[in-house]
Amino acid sequence: MGDVRDRPVRDRWGMTDQPFRFSSRSSRRALALLGGCALLGAVSTPAAAQSPGHGRWVGTWAAGVTAVPDRAPGYPDGRIAYVEDQTVRQVVHTSVGGDALTLRLSNEHGDEALRLGAVHVAARAGAGGTDIDPATDRTVTFGGNRAVTLAAGTRIVSDPVALDVAPDADLVISLYLPGRTEVSTVHQYALQVNAVADGDVTGARTVTPVAAPEQWMFLSGVSVRARTRTSAVVALGDSLSDGVTTTAGANHRWPDLLSDRLRAGRSPDLGVANVGIAGNRLLHDPNPPAGQPVEAYAAYFGPSALHRFERDVLGQPGAEHVIVLLGANDLGQPGSSAPVAETVTAGQLIQGHRRLIARAHARGLKIYGGTVTPLKGAQFGFWSEEIEAKRQAVNRWIRTSGAYDAVIDFDAAVRDPAQPLRLRPDYDGGDHIHLNDAGAQAMAMAVPLRLLR
């Protein structure tokens, strides 16, 4: 049976994560521009339920969840503030297959209990939309019950669901919320059009959307019971891992493309859990200057990687490897979307990396350091000669210290050979910091597959 207990969200030091609350919100584009590169958070249910049967439970899909900024007049950006007597239908993409699955649901940032009247999962029908294949539709239970209530600040893992799950495929997860429910726990950049429909239509082949949010709501992971002995690699990062300027609906984030490489090579059964969060920092939680527009969306940046490492990395079922790509937001946000007082030194960033390494090694995980990619020309004050000197110092330490189990030189993979402080123009997503699909492919190709075998 699945672990169905509501679990308080506590970090390594026993502190309960509190919901971030800010005064207003802004557009997806503004958040993307400030997203930089980062990811990770608090403690999650350690492993999917080990039900009777063969194989091992491993994460096939994941998302780092965050709080939602307070809604304020003047920011009609399409976010769904509340749902009531409605079904939220969401599409996720698998990395590895299996013969059963569990869902991880989250009310970590909610101020009130989250009541789910019904939950269904099915294979997606067709290449677009949220239609399901009725032959694959399954009711999801929690301790044998179809309805479940999550207390504020908790998360839950479902009972195992018997369903043949294919790798590199889309699942549709439908949540029915009978009462008025604030949408409080999300992943902002789904890069996937989901659906909200009236009534309990969790088992319907097709729904009629009243809204089409591009977020994942109350959903943080899917695990499968793999048919073979396998494991998972976790991508811990910021907006570069979150793929904010890659093609929506195409699954072209670099961790997605790494999963494609693994399936085509000698590691077809390795799960990839992408817990990148746009705007995430290694050292600091969101802390926008009061009265600034960034208050509208900074909550989406998520708890610092140090604070969410337990939840998002060590808590991933089957995790044996972690790739870290963080630091750009620590360098670039102070003075724009974070207080000047949070300006960091290269030494402080290095100490943060050492803490991640120690925690991974204490749990037997291999951890690989990704170099910080070029920032020159980036918007919102992300580059100066001082910031560049710090970036070079951190990258030099990552490359030469031997502290990480291996180095993945993302910087070398995407920089312009003619102007190495800048991104290659053909990899530039348009703002001189984020990457397009070709740039994401270059990052995926920079990962030596031998590390993950």
What are the roles of these predicted feature ranges?
Residues M1-S26:
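N-terminal secretory signal peptides that target proteins for export/translocation
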Residues D11-M15, P19, L33-L236, D242-A250, ...:
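N-terminal secretory targeting modules
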Residues S27-L33:
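N-terminal export leaders
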Residues W61, E84-Q90, A113, V119-G128, ...:
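Conserved SGNH/GDSL esterase-like catalytic core that processes O-acyl groups on lipids
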Residues S106, Y176, L236-S239, N274-N280, ...:
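Active-site-proximal beta-strand/loop segments in catalytic clefts of secreted hydrolases
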Residues R281, P289-P293, G302, G332, ...:
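Catalytic His-Asp segment of secreted/periplasmic serine-dependent ester chemistry enzymes
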Residues H353-H361:
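Surface-exposed amphipathic alpha-helices with a cationic face
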